[in-house]
Amino acid sequence: MESVIKKNIIVNAVSLKNGGARTILLQFFNQLILKQNDFRDFDFYLFICDGVELDARDIPISLQIVHLPVNNIVERVNWEVFGLRKWIKEKDLNVSLFVSLQSIGFFFNDKNQLIYYHNPIPVYPKRWNIWKKNETKLWIYKTIFKKIMKWSYNDNSVFIAQVKWVEQALKDTFYINSDQIHIIKPDISSFQNRIHFLNDNGAHQSDPNYIYFPATEYPYKNHLFIVNILSRLLQTAPNEEPLLSTWKIIFTLDINTSGIYQIIKQRGLEKYFLFTGHVSYNEAMKYYQKSKLILFPSYIETFGLPLIEAAFFGKKILASDLSFVSEVLPDYEGLQMIPLTDEDAWVKALLANINHTTSFDSYLPNYETGWDDFFGLIKRYS
């Protein structure tokens, strides 16, 4: 019997270590395990960072996981520009398709490449200040890394975006044609396995009234905006202070290193906030359970997973009135969208919701696209 010549697929994911980026890696890995029978004629080489664990009982022999010591942006660029090319040459590998799960492409001009794009900073129309400590990294991504990304793309690049604004931004920033971009939503079916969280709401009578804002401390997440809203509310409605003092706004930031905490302290607002530091997944779910209101004032997102999590728990959500928000939650009745920079509107909405809290039925959107479409593209372009 004639042996089958397998197609070799390179999958680069060395930068996917935390948060939503790691979720993409885990979803890809789990889907590949589930679909292994559909890819018997393929060999996958998955490159991830040292310390990232991928758990599976039966990893197919067609999947080779390669751990690499890539711990900073210099090591990452070195791997992607030089290291991968050297690795392929040493293995004498004929690659059918390059797959990037981390927005940047590959430096092989004549090869097909499938790029899962989820880094909003290089394509968002905003300038960052290199001299501001909390914007330096964003400036690097917006200027230097953006040029490297452009260098890594070729005429055979195909892009995956999660929401429409990213699709348009890819066209505007890198002059990519519409037929090179596919909008594919991430997998949210795993929430069905978390139904036990709904059965035990985790709240106790002794708990404060929680307002939850799960986000890292980047300027575009808008923590300072929330602090300003609270200050404005106290100034314009001082008679509401006794009620406000029974609430806590939860920031998932480290109180010892947070610049936002220093601002809160200067304004004497400490009693209204709870700083948890980094929380585990289960801890995050508990805070969703306990909270009566979820805030999402972020103005740069490639998807916005906390919106899904909040709707799953049937929570009232106050969010910026941006297109990606309504795209992620197209018909959730607990979503209230507020003009991004309208402080008065946010004050009014916050005050109304702490005076009258409402819960809703658990909700998950039914997206038309998903990982099946992504793996279909792997077959199509390999």
Segments (PLM) and residue ranges:
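Membrane-proximal helix-turn-helix segments that form the acceptor-binding/catalytic region
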Residues: 138-159
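A conserved mid-protein helix/loop that constitutes part of the nucleotide-sugar donor-binding site
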Residues: 19-30, 218-235
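Nucleotide-activated donor-binding/catalytic signature segment of Leloir-type glycosyltransferases, i.e.
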Residues: 259-282
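Glycosyltransferase donor-sugar binding loop
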Residues: 46-51, 214, 242-261, 277
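Conserved donor-binding/catalytic core segment of Leloir-type glycosyltransferases
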Residues: 10, 203-221, 227-230
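Aromatic "clamp/platform" in nucleotide-sugar-dependent glycosyltransferases that forms part
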Residues: 299
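Conserved acidic donor-binding segment of nucleotide-sugar-dependent glycosyltransferases
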Residues: 335-344, 352-354
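Short hydrophobic beta-strand element within catalytic cores of glycosyltransferases
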Residues: 316-319
